[in-house]
Amino acid sequence: MERQEESLSARPALETEGLRFLHTTVGSLLATYGWYIVFSCILLYVVFQKLSARLRALRQRQLDRAAAAVEPDVVVKRQEALAAARLKMQEELNAQVEKHKEKLKQLEEEKRRQKIEMWDSMQEGKSYKGNAKKPQEEDSPGPSTSSVLKRKSDRKPLRGGGYNPLSGEGGGACSWRPGRRGPSSGGUG
């Protein structure tokens, strides 16, 4: 039993000496060359990233070349599909342009018609703004709103014809009077 105890106590002493030796050598190496080791690791990482990206691109090019060489029919079909899609998009765009041109033409025709109506109403001596509402009323099918509203000539005026707000006549509790002349204190000097 004593032998087993001696061998167990001897083993940890050897292991601890080995760990101490390893610790001192690694510690001294890091203390001496630590920054060099850190920078070299960073440099190796960057170089590895660059090379791996280039290798991936090179492999992809080789695969694309192999696929194109093996299946030229697929490439031709892709190009035809792409051309058909472009043609379809161009046709849709042309249709939209035609619709827009037609809409602009209709708006221009409407403006021209309104200008002609304004000119005619001005020649007759009527207000052109009142006529701008007539085309909208004509377009709406339904009961005429003009029959519901009284005409301007049929209405009773709100005030008498001789009403002048600056004269002070015409009724009401408030009337305008000109201010007095002269200083407000009542005397000169």
Swiss-Prot record:
GO molecular function: antioxidant activity; ATPase binding; enzyme binding; signaling receptor activity; ubiquitin-specific protease binding
Membrane topology: Single-pass membrane protein
Pfam families: Selenoprotein_S
Residues recorded as bearing Phosphoserine in the entry: S140
Region of interest called VCP/p97-interacting motif (VIM), as start-end residue ranges on this chain: 78-90
Domain of life: Eukaryota
GO terms classed as biological process: cell redox homeostasis; cellular response to insulin stimulus; cellular response to lipopolysaccharide; cellular response to oxidative stress; endoplasmic reticulum unfolded protein response; ER overload response; ERAD pathway; establishment of protein localization
Family: Belongs to the selenoprotein S family.
Quaternary assembly: Interacts with DERL1 and (via VIM motif) with VCP, suggesting that it forms a membrane complex with DERL1 that serves as a receptor for VCP. Also interacts with DERL2, DERL3 and SELENOK. The SELENOK-SELENOS complex interacts with VCP. Interacts with CCDC47.
Protein name: Selenoprotein S
The gene coding this protein: SELENOS
